[in-house]
Amino acid sequence: MAPLTPQLLLQRGRPKTDKLGKIQSLNLSGLQLLSEHLDPNLLGRLKKLRELDLSNNLLETLPANLGLSHLRILRCTNNQLGDVTALHQFPELEELNLEGNPFLTVSDNLKVSFLLPKLRKVNGKDTASTCSQVENLDRELMDRVTAHWQKFIATVSPEEETDKVRADFMRSAVRDVCYGPESLIEFTQWRVRMIAEELVASGGAQVQDAKVPVEHPQAAGASKFRAREVASKRPGKDPVTLPPSKRVRALPPAQAEGSPMGADGGQAALHLEPLHFLQCHSRNNSPKDLETQLWACAFEPAREEGHSRATSQTVATCGGEAVCVIDCQTGLVLHKYKVPGEEFFSVAWTALTVVTQAGHKKRWNMLAAAGLRGMVRLLHVRAGFCCSVIRAHKKAIATLCFSPSHETHLFTASYDKRIILWDIGVPNQDYKFQASQLLTLNCGSVPLRLCPVATCPDDFLLAGCEGGCYCWDVRLDQPQKQRVCEVNFIFSEDSKVSGQRVDGLAFVNEDVVASKGSGQGTIYLWSWSQTWAGRGRQSVLPVVILVRLQWSPTNLAYFSLSTCPGKNLVLCGDEEGSVWIYDVEHLLKEPPQATTLQPPTQILKWPQPTALGQPVTKTMINTVVANAAFTYLTALTDSNIVSIWRRC
């Protein structure tokens, strides 16, 4: 492609004119333009240009000083942009579209909101929520950099050279001032460097935050398959908050009667405090929505093995027509993906190794989300777009999970009473996936929970179903591509009990499985190896129960349990808004009599946050998940509230 010419600009510009200075709208899309083709001397003659379309080109960056100071609308979709800082040259910009630039991340979205104070829309979406996030994040970073400066300058000797002091402070600030999620570290380090430079230039005077837009209002943020009767809520006007007395101090750990606690051989309490209550799945962004049921959440895997911040504090949540990705420390909603008319039931993470067009290997954390429509949506969260949609089932998908041993292998379980194993592959040059179907597992009832066997995930898959707990052979070296279950696990010799729903299923460690149903008031801990060793040729197999844990006797279903394997913890919510926590390490070392119900180590009571000016006095906790280090715990309710707790 030859460089741009005045004739080409006149041909593609509007209104039609013979003078470059009169063009107000210019379409340069689809011309295979490279960054060096954007000549500032030529484009700078477009003195009245208000709208520019650079979509579907090969731009890696935008040249500085293009001279388009009056530009209001800029479209740069489907390019190769890797940096957005050059956009600051367009101070009047109101609308920006950067979709289809795979190297841009959530950090770049925040940079854009910071650099362009008049921006109203990015990628077709209102920027109010992002601007509010930038405000809060920037305010905290300013406070931390200022505190770091004061601490640093107190240790400096008067004899030290000024230039060396400044350089040392800059390095230490970028290295030591940390806040927010790892996914935003590029933005936070960028802002820390800017704030530090301003501090040094001002001799330590308080940095002003006039650059941050402060007047944008913050955006507020029932399935036929799973709907339960909605718990009572009370309307009002304000966002979800805790009463002041519960926000300023750690909530004392609630202890179930008879819990093993204290120094007399019992277990010490796990101290957790309520940190954030978020209403980010609202339909139509309505703050009055206390009805949307939230179903599943999963913590993002660490971005880099051996990284100093190896434990993720980023959690994906789903419910209603939205999937949200939230930073637990700050409570910021980093990304929100909405599909009108969808009901999301499940999310799952995987980490893929992707080769870029330049031949570089990158590690991508991909999020799969699925629900009512039977489609799996693969989201590249850091870049903020949906890569592909897999039309997996004709009926709703109840749950999904990735294989722990094959990063591209995905199990989907549907209300069509089938489980399908997919190989999603890796994205091509257009960042699209080509999924292939590997296995179909037939179920006698609807599968609700999936759990690859910890010691042999390539061989066997467990599933909790409406009709019980089942196991399938999933070895890919076997010829059959359609398979029936190998074993039906039962928890009692009573056939009535054996056919009951299993809606909670997870491995506590490599051998011990936790499972539960409704109406039993019990969570079972049972041994996979001991149970499987007694199989023989049986198709119905009693499990070897190690421990029975006391839980709510409710007849309501779909309260999912989870585990924190490295900590030997089992977690489950209930119909009263409580979180039941079981530290089972001592129980597994010295199992009690199997018939004895063991009480929870701790119960976190619902703290009754305020929504719309009135307390939410009652809710149900559908799902509870903690990160690997058990520093954060996320509980999802049936009243459109994501509650985040922090271990203290």
UniProtKB/Swiss-Prot annotation:
Q: How is it modified after translation?
A: Ubiquitinated; undergoes 'Lys-48'-linked polyubiquitination leading to proteasomal degradation. Ubiquitination occurs within the WD repeats at the end of the G1 phase. Ubiquitination may be catalyzed by the CUL4-DDB1 E3 ubiquitin-protein ligase complex and other E3 ligases.
Residues recorded as bearing Phosphoserine in the entry:
S259
Chief location of this protein within or outside the cell? nucleus
Q: Name one GO cellular component term.
A: nuclear origin of replication recognition complex
Q: Where is the composition biased (Basic and acidic residues)?
A: 226-237
Q: Where in the cell is it found?
A: Nucleus; Chromosome, Centromere; Chromosome, Telomere; Cytoplasm, Cytoskeleton, Microtubule organizing center, Centrosome
Under the heading PROSITE patterns, the entry gives: LRR, WD_REPEATS_1, WD_REPEATS_2, WD_REPEATS_REGION
A GO molecular function annotation here is:
histone H3K27me3 reader activity
Q: Gene3D superfamilies given for it? A: Ribonuclease Inhibitor, YVTN repeat-like/Quinoprotein amine dehydrogenase
Keyword Transcription regulation carried by entry: no
Q: Does the keyword Nucleus apply?
A: yes
Q: Which GO terms describe its biological process?
A: chromatin organization; DNA replication; establishment of protein localization to chromatin
Instruction: Provide the residue intervals of the WD repeats.
Output: 392-432, 443-482, 497-536, 541-592, 616-648
Give tissue specificity per the record: Testis-specific.
Q: Which UniProt keywords apply?
A: Centromere, Chromatin regulator, Chromosome, Cytoplasm, Cytoskeleton, DNA replication, Kinetochore, Leucine-rich repeat, Nucleus, Phosphoprotein, Repeat, Telomere, Ubl conjugation, WD repeat
State the residue spans of region: Disordered: 214-262
LRR repeat spans:
22-43, 48-69, 70-91, 92-113
**Assembly:** Integral component of the ORC complex. Directly interacts with CDT1, GMNN and ORC2. Interacts with ORC2 only when non-ubiquitinated; this interaction prevents LRWD1 ubiquitination and degradation. Some of these interactions are regulated in a cell-cycle dependent manner. Interaction with ORC1 occurs predominantly during G1. Association with phosphorylated ORC1 during mitosis is not efficient. Interaction with CDT1 occurs during G1 phase, as well as during mitosis with phosphorylated CDT1. Interaction with GMNN occurs from G1/S to mitosis.
Which purpose does this protein serve, as stated in its record?
Required for G1/S transition. Recruits and stabilizes the origin recognition complex (ORC) onto chromatin during G1 to establish pre-replication complex (preRC) and to heterochromatic sites in post-replicated cells. Binds a combination of DNA and histone methylation repressive marks on heterochromatin. Binds histone H3 and H4 trimethylation marks H3K9me3, H3K27me3 and H4K20me3 in a cooperative manner with DNA methylation. Required for silencing of major satellite repeats. May be important ORC2, ORC3 and ORC4 stability.
Q: Which family does it belong to?
A: Belongs to the LRWD1 family.
Q: What is known of its domains?
A: The entire WD repeat region is required for the interaction with ORC, CDT1 and GMNN, as well as for association with chromatin and for binding to histone H3 and H4 trimethylation marks H3K9me3 and H4K20me3. Centrosomal localization requires additional conformation.
Protein name, entry field: Leucine-rich repeat and WD repeat-containing protein 1
- Species of origin reads Mus musculus (Mouse)
